[in-house]
Amino acid sequence: PYRFLYCWFSHTCVSAAEVFGGFFILSSEVRCVEDEFFMREALRIARNAEGRTAPNPMVGAVIVKDGRIVAEGWHRKAGTAHAEIHALKMAGELARGATLYVTLEPCAHYGRTGPCAKAVAESGIQRVVAAMRDPNPLVAGKGMKILEDAGVEVKVGVLADEAQKLNEVFLKWVVTKCPFVVLKTAMSLDGKIATRSGASQWITGEAARHCVHKLRDIYAGILVGIGTVLADDPSLTTRLPGGSGKNPVRIILDSKARTPLTAKVLTDGAAETIIAATQNAPKTRIERLKAAGAVVLVCGREKVDLAALMKMLGEREISSVFVEGGGRVNFSFLRAGLVDKIHAFLAPKLIGGRDALTPVEGEGFADLADAVELEHIKTEILGSDLHLSAYVKTCRKEGADVHRNY
């Protein structure tokens, strides 16, 4: 019965009853809408640091007093002050008696920074609204308990789905200690990623390629196979206007350690390069790669064990991997049940050719029941190309879907 309004001039939230009837009624309905409104603002500002906080989550915080936003903050980088601390410093004495909206439960442990829950409790904040509890076992409800024990009113679960989506990378990594894996492919309308001669630059247009570089900017690692390195000598860097992009860690699947010492990924110094080799790789080649500055991870005897590699990367706090490999690499990841999300770019071109490469090569799945299904599909037009993003519906590896149940 009472509509919630927000006055952008005064930065104040009021009910429609107050505006139109000359009196104020704060019903539970109005409070719920108010909580959602300010939580959306916290979620929005959390994305200011997208791609910069790994392996930490993105977190936004908003402090509200008398229906007005008096302070806000967001976590900028791992090892630096958390969102709540930035907001509290901005609020100063205005924090006393105010409400804090935060996208993730305040931390309760001493790490590279102190516990936020304790700082919030000592600030005089009267009420804390969190979008979701932190699945990190170091926290796991402890932050909210600190606040409750200090007499702070707490509420959890406001826009929880949006908060989980915001931190899908962190939630996968903190629960499984394996990175969130995103597979990207660009193809023609007839499903070709290159011509029969191997030409692939450029199938998609400038807008789609710009989108790919924005994706590189937000994920921690980028992965290709040795075939891509030998054929294209890519830099695997992020190229955005003004040079604002962050370069991901380069990861090369190279079972025999064949990466040339002259390859850009070893000589340009743009980012760390990890070579995933096998026990059968010549030790002299491995030592030369190490001497050239590469990190060499040995996983598997004849072929790179992708599941083992993901665990190794997770242990190195690489919380997300952007796979830009060819058809064989893509199929290997899909068959292993390691892919969480897919970005596909479809160009209005017809290439044809029985020998032209496709996005998913290998032996393929023999039965339709084994096919990888997608869900939560979104599409957009980028220039003349179609961009499709989706999540893998059925995780094919036991335990791989733990993060889907946060």
Task: Outline where the language-model segments fall.
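Flexible, acidic/Gly-rich N-terminal and inter-domain linker regions that tether
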Residues: 25-80
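Acidic, Ala/Val/Gly-enriched low-complexity intrinsically disordered segments
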Residues: 14-19, 29-30, 400-402
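A broad detector of short, well-ordered amphipathic alpha-helices
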Residues: 40, 44-47, 71, 82-85, ...
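Zn2+-dependent cytidine deaminase-like catalytic core
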Residues: 63-162, 249, 269, 274, ...
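Enzymes that bind and transform nitrogen-containing heteroaromatic metabolites
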Residues: 32-40, 44-56, 112, 180-181, ...
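Proteins enriched for Cys/Gly/acidic motifs involved in redox and nucleic-acid/cofactor modification
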Residues: 52-55, 144, 158-186
